[in-house]
Amino acid sequence: MASMPPTPEAQGPILFEDLAVYFSQEECVTLHPAQRSLSKDGTKESLEDAALMGEEGKPEINQQLSLESMELDELALEKYPIAAPLVPYPEKSSEDGVGNPEAKILSGTPTYKRRVISLLVTIENHTPLVELSEYLGTNTLSEILDSPWEGAKNVYKCPECDQNFSDHSYLVLHQKIHSGEKKHKCGDCGKIFNHRANLRTHRRIHTGEKPYKCAKCSASFRQHSHLSRHMNSHVKEKPYTCSICGRGFMWLPGLAQHQKSHSAENTYESTNCDKHFNEKPNLALPEETFVSGPQYQHTKCMKSFRQSLYPALSEKSHDEDSERCSDDGDNFFSFSKFKPLQCPDCDMTFPCFSELISHQNIHTEERPHKCKTCEESFALDSELACHQKSHMLAEPFKCTVCGKTFKSNLHLITHKRTHIKNTT
């Protein structure tokens, strides 16, 4: 209980000790916040009464009041409620942990919850802060709560590759790599995806759905990134202007590519014909492109083509969904009823001819796009463009076996695995 203040002498002045109510540190901790406020307000009123009486020692009274208020506020800050049951978590035995990923927790290390509960129990038992700091090696409770706990890191261990994770959900995602689990399958082409969102985006190729519509025109797109790229065409400001024809561009690389069309520099001449091209990949077309005269003929309309792929694509123009022009009788695609083009080898569909033609190089194993720096070939022009960026950057990581360089250590480690497989 609170100790009684000393009895004042009848003739002496009224001092702070005559009015103050004293509490021990343990009693202050157990006080309700309203009781601490009442004690502090009562002490303050008593001191104000003493000051009004004109007694000596007013500076000492104010100093004592300030110290008393600070002590109560500090104790109020150090008071923490118990946020979990005061029961220690039992250690999981090896029999109970069979088949349970949580049993992979490192043995001999207390969990974070148990450490916090131990701290709260110590506070509730009114252990002085000095003893508490000596026990945990810190000075204040704020340092205890804010200090990182090394035992909480990498406590979930993968049984396949011994890799550690700090959260069980990360371990579950990682284990799909070993099992090869891909549970989202397309019902049209049979392609499998790891995530439902990727399957939903892929399904738009078959359904022709384009949910992202431009607010300034009637164009629509399957992906939001395509819409964002399209919106740049509506921007009026085009800071880069061609000095020859006055055409404006939003990006400097686009202007540089356009200016090649006005000059004879960096042009490539075909060995099969007299045509010139601004880009070298155009020279890598199949030889049948330059053969004089059409080589492939369609069976229904007797129309001739230079490449064998186009007669198969021409089937789309003879179905019932095509519309006939009233002037000259030619058939055209009805884009309102247009169905995506399907690859005859893998049943994948594409919205336009150019994408399907580029895709065909994957099945024919043709690699017409060749890198000028390292002479590596690629099936798609986009793959070549992505590869050429690697030559622009520094590659400080060098393979000691073949001498090939890489821009990151991760790529070097992945490359070294090919040498290990070849030796085995």
UniProtKB/Swiss-Prot annotation:
Subcellular location: Nucleus
CC annotations in GO: nucleus
Pfam families listed in its UniProt record: KRAB, zf-C2H2
Domain KRAB span(s) in chain numbering: 14-88
Record flagged with keyword DNA-binding: yes
Main location: nucleus
Family of this protein: Belongs to the krueppel C2H2-type zinc-finger protein family.
Record protein name field: Zinc finger protein 597
Organism: Homo sapiens
Protein encoded by which gene: ZNF597
